[in-house]
Amino acid sequence: MANPKLVLAYSGGLDTSVAIKWLQERGYDVIACCLDLGEGKDLDFVKEKALKVGAMKSYVIDVKDEFANEYALIALQANALYEGKYPLVSALSRPLIAKKLVEIAELEGAVAVAHGCTGKGNDQVRFEVSIKALNPDLDVIAPVREWSWSREEEIEYAKKHGIPIPVDLDSPFSIDQNLWGRSNECGILEDPWAAPPEEAYELTASLENAPDVPDVIEIGFEQGVPVTLNGKAYPLAQLILELNALAGKHGVGRIDHVENRLVGIKSREVYECPGAITLIKAHKELEDLTLVREVAHFKPIIEQKIAEVIYNGLWFSPLKDALVAFLKETQKNVTGVVRVKLFKGHAIVEGRKSPFSLYDEKLATYTSEDEFDHQAAVGFISLYGLPTKVHSIVNKQNKASVPTGQ
């Protein structure tokens, strides 16, 4: 009788390499799955390593465009920053990884999927909730959570089974990266008082090493979608990667954040998101120009909720779908160009224009070109302040009629 098949989310690192052998010992034929999310990893090497360790098959799938257009774009249009800081780098990729795991499992006739998450992070929740939403019949196995080995025990197991030890194993940091940014934790970063060492960063220059001359760029949007950079059209994934290089050179997008994890603990994380931060700032400025006041004031409530829903692993939920439906409606007129200066860690918006601009210079100006009806303000103020005026009159009358105590 053939062994049951299992699809493993494979990164090429020690944990998921050891997981292949560990799962085989438990009777599974392991199919490795690695996605290209724009992190710049040597995926041919990863594919061959999975097969060398013992996977019966190894998938490598380029999902950069899908990730940019269907996941990162929603976060951008929501100006999504969890707790006002984190652009949801890892949180955005997990539902897409889960989706591909399920697709391959169904294609291969697998009975289970597995991931390499620990028992104290958010990702285990994101993966497992997403997988069960997409296919409730699949079993989900978390080898790292189950085996509870020390790092030394894991290395010993790897040596015993001839599993290659990564050359960067001595690095104290735990890193996750995709085209939307890079997250870094562990090592000295676990001390919230300790300054992140420069070796913790890869995508961004320090302020000291950033150029002394700014770059001024122009980002074009169509219905909330970034489509051009300095007048040149790019697919969204490529545009984000181009911005990572441009803004990263100037130190834009470094984030040092003590965040509240879904599992109940606080965690100190260091993020680099040069492209994401630059795009969010530009997009928000274009919205300020094109959204009516009521939508502009209400949308941040939806934005905060979308950020929480994504962070908490509820991508495939009815609530997320409903929130995104509102979000998409707001983007119909978010078309135009934003000019941004990149300099010493800052993305500074210096100009914005749109064919749907609600800014009317003849109404806003204080020059002789002014077309605003100043006399209309008299009646407006009277009606606007009427409830407050009536309240004040009634209170004064009641106070006057109340006898003072002896």
Swiss-Prot record:
Subcellular location field: Cytoplasm
Entries under Gene3D superfamilies matching the protein: Argininosuccinate synthetase, chain A, domain 2 (3.90.1260.10), HUPs (3.40.50.620), Single helix bin (1.20.5.470)
One Pfam match: Arginosuc_syn_C
Gene Ontology annotations for the cellular component aspect, listed alphabetically: cytoplasm
Broad class of enzyme this protein falls into: ligase
GO molecular function, one term: ATP binding
Source superkingdom: Bacteria
Catalytic activity line of the entry: L-citrulline + L-aspartate + ATP = 2-(N(omega)-L-arginino)succinate + AMP + diphosphate + H(+)
Any one GO biological process: urea cycle
Keyword Iron-sulfur part of the UniProt annotation: no
Pathway: Amino-acid biosynthesis; L-arginine biosynthesis; L-arginine from L-ornithine and carbamoyl phosphate: step 2/3
UniProt: L-aspartate binding residues: T118, N122, D123
Keywords assigned: Amino-acid biosynthesis, Arginine biosynthesis, ATP-binding, Cytoplasm, Ligase, Nucleotide-binding
Enzyme Commission number(s): 6.3.4.5
Assembly notes: Homotetramer.
Family: Belongs to the argininosuccinate synthase family. Type 1 subfamily.
Protein name according to UniProt: Argininosuccinate synthase
Annotated organism of origin: Geobacillus kaustophilus (strain HTA426)
